[in-house]
Amino acid sequence: KHFKDFELSLDFKIDEHGKYNSGVFLRRPTKKGIGPAYQINIGRGAAGEPVGLYLDQWLHKGDEKDAVRKPREWNRLRIRAIGPCIQVWLNEKSIVDFTHKNPPAYLLKPGPIALQTYGAEGHNGWVQFRRMQIIEWKEQ
């Protein structure tokens, strides 16, 4: 299914090794070569992989110092994507409130939500997700 404006909530727990990270891609383009999707990066700030908003560069580093994420525990992530505005809460604390000025049109089109895992430093790592819920926001 493709989503345009929505709120996604989920719990995650992630490996604490090195630069290993995971992520949630928003409105991911389905055709190759169009461009990158918004990604809510899920990682360890101490390793340079904070929970924050990434496109082809960091748009907002969010929990850069790991002040909100709880290592080795379940963490609650809530993501709201309405038009060019992306908001993220980690454990009920707002960590990203970003409005993309003049984004490429493809970033505002409906697309799938994708979960990602990304090994680093030769380490496969792991991530677990649970309690996922998506609420679609209807256009007014």
Task: Map each language-model feature to its residues.
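Carbohydrate-interacting regions of secretory-pathway proteins
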Residues: 1-140
